[in-house]
Structures are given as structure tokens and as C-alpha cells.
Amino acid sequence: MSESPKKVIVGMSGGVDSSVSAWLLQQQGYQVEGLFMKNWEEDDGEEYCTAAADLADAQAVCDKLGIELHTVNFAAEYWDNVFELFLEEYKAGRTPNPDILCNKEIKFKAFLEFAAEDLGADYIATGHYVRRADVNGKSRLLRGLDGNKDQSYFLYTLGHEQIAQSLFPVGELEKPQVRKIAEDLGLVTAKKKDSTGICFIGERKFRDFLGRYLPAQPGKIITVDGDEIGEHQGLMYHTLGQRKGLGIGGTKDGSEDPWYVVDKDVENNVLIVAQGHEHPRLMSVGLIAQQLHWVDREPFTGTLRCTVKTRYRQTDIPCTINALNDDRIEVIFDEPVAAVTPGQSAVFYSGEVCLGGGIIEQRLPLTV
């Protein structure tokens, strides 16, 4: 008597990646079911329509593939474990990454537990562009095959046990191949554009959205030389290295180089700017990271040579990591790096393997 197929619950977002993931798993002989997660309670018509359209697309794909679609509401968990923390970070003048938090708290915690306990799943699957490899009994997280789409940066908080319970079918493919499969199958999501914007909250005017929850606190814009040259509407709307949306032109000395945010003085509510994207004040020689997560869940001690990304899609930066204590490390770059931003994540790699990462607590500025 042959063993019954393993049951996989695919997180169906209404997008092309999760749609094709479900089909690929069917081809591999798994018993596949879908789950649509509602993680945000919409409070205006436009948002409601987008969420309803995503659910309709997910349902249409499941109908086409002949699989059941479950739905679950994680809005309370999202608010408590992702959104409130996201607002706290912004209030403190830092720039958080909600997608990383959402993966940690919702997709690979609430969803994983619900799929296993309520739906009897052996595995969950998502449309993330990452791969897993099992080495010496431990699952490792690898970059996705498509370098342009690799999403390991967003999944560094996962431990080997979570990865062992997760499948990432499109991680072995390039995006154009995924779209081609969807087109060949006649899936409604084949030409749907990729979602951007805050995880689950969708595409909307970020400034308007943040303004609903955090009161704007206007303050001065000051140059690195101490000249006041404008007013900002709130430090939370600005991030290091930002060029657009400052509302300031050239200066009295006639230099037309664009202005960049090089620092935030949170205590005095001052935005500090300089001209030129390689201004020394924008450069860092390293960083201190905290809230560390290592995929192998082994504590890090000593020193390590590896590469780091301080933001998504950045080219890997060779670096040396030194352990400061159990939950803090110092990272020294081989070459200075622009716009290292507290609140964002530093994620470490050894070749194709994502080792883990942490939150940037402070940058180590280039002193000239």
C-alpha cells in the first residue's frame, strides 16, 4: 500500500507566484489546498475592492486547479505583532521593514500554526523566491535562483525548523518562466503586476496612510553646515539617502547638486541634508546590529567573514562581523557604504546561503 501524499497548504495571495506554486506542487504529487489570509481590516472603498479582487483571483486559480481554498482572518495578530511595532519604530525616527516582521509573525508563525493544527498540513508553501537545502539534518535558506527576484532578505528571521516545514516552488525558477507557466495554464493571475507597498496594506499614498496613525510634527531642514533651508512635515516621512520629496532646490552658492537626507536629529526634530549622493556624512564604515536571528539558531561568537545587505536588492558588501554579546554584533564593511539606515535590517550571506541578520541599531559613520 503506497503512502498517502503529503498535504501542503499554499498561501494564496491572488498573485502569480503563489498561483504557479500551487500548480507546481500538484505536479510534484502533493495534496494541495490554498489559504487566503486577510490581515488588514480595510476602512475605505478602494482598499476593500483591492482585497476583494485578490480573494476573487485566488478563488479563480483554485477553481481552475481543482483545489480547495480556505480563508482565515489574521487582522488582530497583524495589528498587535506587526503594525503597532511598525508605528513605534517610525515614532522613534527609525525606518522599519514591515515585510520582514510580517513574514516572522504572520506567514511563518500564525499561518504555519493554523495550517498544521487546523488544516492538518505537513508543509506550508509560499510564492517567495528563495530555496531551501537540507544539510546534516538542518534546513538552510538559500537565495532564489532569479537574482533579480531573490527574497531571502525578507526571510532572514526564519529558523531552520520553520524552513523545514516550508516549500518554495518558484525559488527554483526565474520570474519570466513563472509568468509563462501561468499563461500556458490560462490562470487569471498570469499578467497581474507584482504588488508593492506595505505588506498586506497594499499600494496607497504612504504619507497619507501614516498620517492617519501618527500626527505629523513639522520641523527644520538644516544643512550639514548648519544653515536652515526649509521645513519638513515629519521625520517619519524621510529616510537616509532620500532625495525626492524634500521640497528644496539649489543653494546660495549656486550648486545645483541634489539634496540628500544624511541624518535625523530625533531629539530636536531636525532633518539634516547635504548635497551629492556620495557626501561623506551619508557614508558608513560599519554598523551595530541587534535583535539577531541566525537561521541555524546557534549563538554567534567570535568573528566571521561574509557579505551583508543593508537593504533589499543591494549588491552584497564584503564585511567582517564581530560578536559584542549574545544579541549585538559589530559589522565592519570592506568599503564605506551609503545610506545605512537604523531600523532597517542587515542580512548576512555566505555564498548562496542566507545566514541570518538583525536590525540596524546604529551606523558607524565615516569620519573625514
From Swiss-Prot:
Active-site residues, as the UniProt record annotates them: 102 (nucleophile), 199 (cysteine persulfide intermediate)
Keyword Cell cycle: no
Keywords on record: ATP-binding, Cytoplasm, Disulfide bond, Nucleotide-binding, RNA-binding, Transferase, tRNA processing, tRNA-binding
Reaction(s) this enzyme catalyzes, per UniProt: S-sulfanyl-L-cysteinyl-[protein] + uridine(34) in tRNA + AH2 + ATP = 2-thiouridine(34) in tRNA + L-cysteinyl-[protein] + A + AMP + diphosphate + H(+)
Highest taxon above the source species: Bacteria
Disulfide cross-links: 102-199
Subcellular location: Cytoplasm
Interaction with target base in tRNA: annotated segments: 97-99
GO MF, any single term: ATP binding
InterPro entries: MnmA-like (IPR004506), MnmA-like_C (IPR046885), MnmA-like_central (IPR046884), MnmA-like_central_sf (IPR023382), Rossmann-like_a/b/a_fold (IPR014729)
UniProt site positions, description: Interaction with tRNA: 128, 344
Job description of the protein: Catalyzes the 2-thiolation of uridine at the wobble position (U34) of tRNA(Lys), tRNA(Glu) and tRNA(Gln), leading to the formation of s(2)U34, the first step of tRNA-mnm(5)s(2)U34 synthesis. Sulfur is provided by IscS, via a sulfur-relay system. Binds ATP and its substrate tRNAs.
Assembly, per entry: Interacts with TusE.
Protein's UniProt name: tRNA-specific 2-thiouridylase MnmA
Gene source species: Salmonella typhimurium (strain LT2 / SGSC1412 / ATCC 700720)
